[in-house]
Amino acid sequence: MAVSSSFASEMATDTNGQVYKKVAWRLVPFLCLCYLAAYLDRVNVGFAKLQMLSDLSFSNTVYGLGAGIFFLGYVIFEVPSNILLHKVGAKWWIARIMISWGLIGAAMAFVQTPTQFYVLRFLLGVAEAGFIPGVLLYLTYWFPSAWRGRIIALFLAAIPMSNIIGGPLSGWILKSLGGVAGLAGWQWLFIVETVPSIVLGFAILLFLDNSVD
């Protein structure tokens, strides 16, 4: 979303909100799609659990540790990630977040040992760290304080939408794709649900601008 100096001037003098409405229509639906992709990558391990544990002979303890270690990586790197977002530029860093978590999430399809499971879940947390705070920070670049409450509320509406879509989609993949190309349903789940993250990550480089300045 390249911004010209004249457009920036329009935003500065926008008295009836028409320019901000245009920006909202351009940014918010796209960022909601990005959040949906983030949600799918974060929770698909829960949908994959039964098939994955059966195929790999993992115990519930192994699964629980692997599922939880995601948040360790996420918490440790959340603040550094947002510092780097500010230094590197929003579109570059958010794109990096999405592409890297997509690739790591896809690699989950080829896990064979508990150690591989732990490492990839931790790295997934590291990769995804800072995404939501980073997007919220990015939105503050485009909207004044009077607009931020409603814009952030619209973005966060992606949370229930993700819950509505994520479960049925994951169930369909597990049921319909199991055995295709010799891969189990849980493997296809990790592969299919990470493709949108990678595609959207590259789309960010074309679609977003670092700031209004």
Q: Language-model segments: which ranges?
A:
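Cytoplasmic helix-loop-helix junction between adjacent transmembrane helices
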Residues: L120-A157
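Symmetry-related core transmembrane helices of the 12-TM Major Facilitator Superfamily/SLC fold
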Residues: G185-L206
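Helix-breaking motifs and short loop linkers at transmembrane-helix boundaries and internal kinks
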Residues: S57, G89, F110-Q116, A127, ...
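Glycine-rich segments within core transmembrane alpha-helices of 12-TM secondary carriers
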Residues: G149-K175, S197
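Cytosolic juxtamembrane N-terminal segment immediately preceding the first transmembrane helix
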Residues: A2-V43
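Residue-level signature of mid-helix packing/kink "hotspots" within the transmembrane helices
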Residues: V43, F71-V79, A129, N163-I164
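Conserved MFS/SLC helix-loop-helix module at the cytosolic interface between two early adjacent transmembrane helices
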Residues: I76-T115
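Extracytoplasmic
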Residues: R26-N60, I76, G166, S170
